[in-house]
């Protein structure tokens, strides 16, 4: 393995900066880039307690990052502890983490906000050196992002010394995301954007089907044989759908015609923790032929065996489509391959438009809006649990 130029650039520049936004295509190694500065720092100083907080929009991604970091840390014989804390974490583990935090903690925005509500939150975060926000482009402009932004502002109130690293896929306006990353800091002058050149364009097709595409409906049942044919021709395929109900129906219908007994699994947020973790583990080992998934597997998962993506239904935005396509060929300079299968004739038009926009590298416009008031109310309730509210200080945190 050899580090890419932009990964080295981040490590060299961040020592003199307060924050950095890394823009890189899917599979470009941006998550590893984000961890290089913390690892280099912890080798020099060997601190105790929480050193680096990594925030991911998905539980599956947080789990995947922990697995991917364990191996190199062991190989380099580094004395670094790393753990994951999400809604799936056992209560005994959560208690242990609260009393004896690991050096690297992988978590989600919701779990991070809950940690800030502890009476011991100031002590817990007092020595934090790095905050990494992965897939920041999916968080910065929705209610989860509003809550996360408030949490980061409170974290800056607790500890003014940590550095922030934002990791993002290619977007149309990186400066807007950098502004969000630095909101509340007044440190924009001491930050940078590091951009990795884009890869080869993905290979996307809309398969011709022998059956007529229906005028209405969203099941995609007419294309079952086409889907199974694509699965048979590839090592591992992820079939993305837009709803959990759609994933359940498709899974059952595929099994009815799965005469070759391909190992096909299902993954969505309503499944039990044990079921989801088992699917993720089997995928990481390359044991599954296909997985039918919702947005629960949209982001960042590093499964090298995946060589094809099927998006069933119209893509909900160009950026999201590129993100999903990037699950295939998820490594440096491999071409991602995908098939778009519309569920009705109107979606056929949307699919053709989406392919055209991807080929022209026309990304979705980024809109930046004011935060939601209900999110502010939720944040204030959590903040009041950690300590009595000081009106002036609370105003500065929120502002």
Question: What is the meaning of each model-derived region?
Answer:
Residues 2-113, 117-386, 391-399:
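Helicase motor core with emphasis on the C-terminal RecA-like subdomain
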